[in-house]
Amino acid sequence: AEKKLPQILSGKEVELLLAQPKASDMKGCRDKAMLEVLYATGIRVSELINLNMDDVNLPGGFIRCEGSGKVRIIPVYPEAQQMLRDYMEDVRPKMIANPAEQSLFVNVSGERMSRQGFWKIIKSYQEKAQIDKDITPHTLRHSFAAHLLENGADLRSIQEMLGHSDISSTQVYAQLVKQNLKAVYNKYHPK
C-alpha cells in the first residue's frame, strides 16, 4: 500500500510558527521552548511531554529521549537550548505545584502537560501564524526530517535521530524531498 506522505512546513513556515509564542510571558516562554525542542530534535509529541528535568543536558547541548524501548541522545541547536534554559530557570519554578515534580513541561496546574493540552497549543499558534496547512502534532517531526534531508543529511543519521527501527519509515522523507524538488523544478525551470 502506498504510504500517504505527511505534510511538512517550509523553513519559512516553521520560523513563522516558532515566532508566535511571546517569550515575555510564562505560558509563551514554555510554549516557545516546547516548539523549539520539537523542531530541534524531531522527537514525537508523546516523547516531548514525557521528558523529565534530568533528560536535559544543557552544557552538553542534548536531550535524552526514551521512545519505543530505545534511548536516544539527540543534539539541540543553540537557540532551542537558550529557550529551554530560560524556561527551566525562570518560568518552570513558578509553574510547578510540587517542588518534587520531575516533568519538564507542565500545564497551568503545574502538572505534566498532556497530549491534548499540547495539541490545543500548537493549533492556536497555527491560527495566529495563518498557516493554511493541515498541521498535526507530528508536523514539526516530519519537517525536521525533511529539512535535514534537503540540507544533505543522510537517511541513516535521520533514522537514528527519529528512532525508527526500520529504514523504510525514514525513506518516506526522501520521497517528500523528491516531490518538493519536482515542484520547484516545474515552477522555476524556464522551459
Describe every region a protein language model picked out.
Residues A1-K191:
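Conserved catalytic core of the tyrosine transesterase superfamily
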